[in-house]
């Protein structure tokens, strides 16, 4: 029996340490117990190499309470979506309003601030707003994909949306005459248009180049110029995009 006794925890269990959420995780490829901050989920992950050592991971997390508190304090606040809020969608300021009927995007005839109108309150309202944002994301990202694919002389790929935690887009090259497949994070709609467009160009370049070699980056630069500012923006603000739609 280990120093920490029989396993008292399960993979995926959650603890609270220093007021912060800590998730226990088994990773059989890990060599030791460790802690890391997951900024996209707003939590700390305590990893153990086996189920038997999860208790050790939990004890390690409790022993590092001060570190956990300091790191979690650096995270952007969780941002709910409520009537009266103003958010940016592809860099445009958008107002959120409560209204009866189907959730929808409204472009005022006078050219003023667009509005997302949705029913409900609390999480129900937020879910309805996110559906509208996803529809905008699908439309804009598909348009930009068609634009960049045409510039590259590549066939228009199949487009999908998801909510991945570790990447903003992914590309599977087409084989044997079949179209490629590109999936984007819907949260790109919450980034400036130029940043989202860079991600589209990046994934479209993968329709021709599977790696990140010089030819790949030359394709990207031809479409959107220097990618460095856009990559830096995502590193600096990516965690904030994942905080949207999460109650504070």
Role assignments for model-derived ranges:
Residues 203:
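Walker B catalytic acidic pair
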């Amino acid at each position: 029996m280990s120093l920490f006794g029989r396993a008292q925890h399960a993979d995926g269990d959650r603890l609270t340490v220093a007021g912060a959420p800590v998730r226990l995780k088994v990773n059989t490829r890990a060599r030791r117990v460790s802690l890391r901050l997951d900024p996209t989920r707003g939590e700390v992950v305590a990893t153990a190499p086996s189920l038997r050592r999860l208790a050790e991971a939990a004890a390690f997390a409790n022993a590092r309470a001060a570190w956990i508190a300091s790191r979690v304090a650096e995270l952007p606040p969780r941002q709910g979506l409520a009537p009266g809020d103003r958010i940016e969608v592809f860099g445009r300021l958008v107002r959120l309003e409560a209204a009866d009927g189907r959730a929808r995007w409204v472009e005022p005839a006078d050219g003023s601030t667009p509005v997302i109108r949705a029913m409900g309150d609390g999480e129900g309202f937020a879910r309805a707003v996110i559906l509208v944002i996803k529809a905008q994301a699908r439309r804009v990202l598909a348009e930009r994909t068609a634009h960049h694919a045409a510039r590259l002389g590549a066939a228009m790929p199949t487009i999908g949306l998801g909510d991945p935690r570790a990447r903003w887009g992914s590309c599977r090259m087409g084989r044997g005459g079949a179209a490629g497949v590109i999936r984007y994070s819907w949260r790109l709609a919450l980034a400036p248009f130029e940043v989202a467009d860079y991600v589209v160009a990046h994934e479209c370049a993968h329709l021709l180049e599977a790696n990140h070699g010089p030819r790949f980056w030359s394709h990207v630069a031809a479409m959107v110029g220097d990618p460095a500012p856009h990559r830096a923006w995502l590193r600096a603000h990516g965690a904030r995009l994942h905080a949207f739609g999460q109650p504070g």
